[in-house]
Structure formats: structure tokens, C-alpha cells
Amino acid sequence: VGDIERIPTHIAGLDENMQGGIPQGHICIVAGQSGAMKSSVTFSLLYNAVLYGETSGIYVTLEQGKDSLRSHMSNMGMNVDDPRVRNRIAIIDLSDLRVQLDEQGMSNRIDWMGQLIKQLTSYRQSIGFELLVFDSLGAFFTLTKMENPRDEIFRLFEACRRLELTSFFICEMTGEDHKQFGEYGVEDYLSDGVMHLTMERTGDDITRKLGVIKMRHTHHRLGYSPILWSAEDQRFTIS
């Protein structure tokens, strides 16, 4: 296990309890309820991996527009126009593509997953990116109305493995008691890693916590730790 190349999360307190980071090429899901900061935490993984490492990545968004995402992350101190990261992080808004296809009357006839995989393959070959964030799986299936989401998730994860991407897929917690990672019941066992963000209420206070539920080829600490953002250090910290 010691010889595996790893990508540090740059979440203070996490890497030291996870053998230095996430194994390269892993497919991880980042799950949590609405408001648990899934997008912010996952964007910080990408941003700091690019800022401190020799890598590049793509953030695929469907949840919020490109400008809104840039502005939100910039307010947190993660400026995508910073010269150190500017040419190494691409933000792709898939809802733009949906609008174009709707206008052409094509959105119902298209193999969405095939198109997405084709686009990722093309970017991988042209700009050589290594990290992928997908925000979010649920929004993608709502947008595309695919008939067999479980099969399509398998197809997407396999494509990411083939392209040797280290990938983070954002998912909502679902099920009657909100204990299911993702909406289709297969995301957690098809993935290599599961990071779970929770919100715990005590009186009027809410504490966000992070737990690493699963990380293949990695000795990691189980249990949940409070997670806080430090604007000064531009990183999350767990305590």
C-alpha cells in the first residue's frame, strides 16, 4: 500500500490520517445533504491539488452556472484567475450544452453518456488533465432523463478508470432515512472511495463534519471530524 502514488487533499488533519492522500486514479464520491458544502470541499480538493502540485483538472458543473461558481469560490479565497492555476483548471457548464441541444430539438435523441465520455476523452488527449470533479450525478440524470442510470453510472466510472482520471462525483444522500450514498444505490460500491459530509445541529448551532467511509488501498481513520474553512490558508481543516 505504501508505494501508491497519492493526491493530497490539502485538508489539514486529513492527509496525515490517510497515508498522504487519495490514491491516483481512484473514483470517489463526495456525499451529503444540501448545504453540507460538498461543492466547496470538492472544489478545494481540485484547486489545491493544482495550486501545490504538477497537475490539472476539470470541474463539470450542472448545479450552478460557471460565473456563479467562480464568484462563490473566489469569495472563499480560491481565485481561478490566479496565474498559478488559471490555465490548469477548466470549468465546464453542461447545462449550456442542454440549452443548445434543446434549441436544435436534439436533447431527447442524444446518447448523453456517450457524448460526455467522448468530451472527457477529447479533453484528456488535448490538455492532458488528470483530475475530474462532477457536480453532480443526480443533476446529470435529472437533466438527461436517462432510462438506466445504474448502467450509465457503471459506464461513466469505467470510462474514468480507462482514462486514468482521479475523479470526484458529488452525490446527495437519499433513501427514507437519508443514509444511502447517492440516488441510485450503486454509487458507493462502484466507487473506490466515499467521503461523507454531515450537518449536526446542537441547539441553534450547526456543525459540519467529514468522514471517510471507504478508501480502497488506504489505511484511514474511521469516524467523523468537524470541518472548517480557513480563508487565510485557503483550505479546510478537520479537528
Annotate each predicted stretch with a short phrase:
Residues 1-76:
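The Walker A/P-loop phosphate-binding site
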Residues 20-23, 48-53, 81-85, 122-126, ...:
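Conserved catalytic network of the ASCE P-loop NTPase/AAA+ motor domain
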Residues 1-11, 109, 116, 122-123, ...:
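NTP-binding/hydrolysis catalytic cores, primarily Walker-type P-loop NTPases
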Residues 28, 107-189:
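P-loop NTPase motor core
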Residues 7-11, 15, 24, 63-70, ...:
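Amphipathic alpha-helical transducer elements in NTP-driven molecular machines
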Residues 167-232:
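Phosphate-binding/switch region of NTP-binding enzymes
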Residues 28, 58-60, 90-92, 168, ...:
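Hydrophobic/aromatic beta-strand patches that form the interior of the parallel beta-sheet core
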Residues 55-138:
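Conserved inter-motif catalytic segment of the P-loop NTP-binding fold
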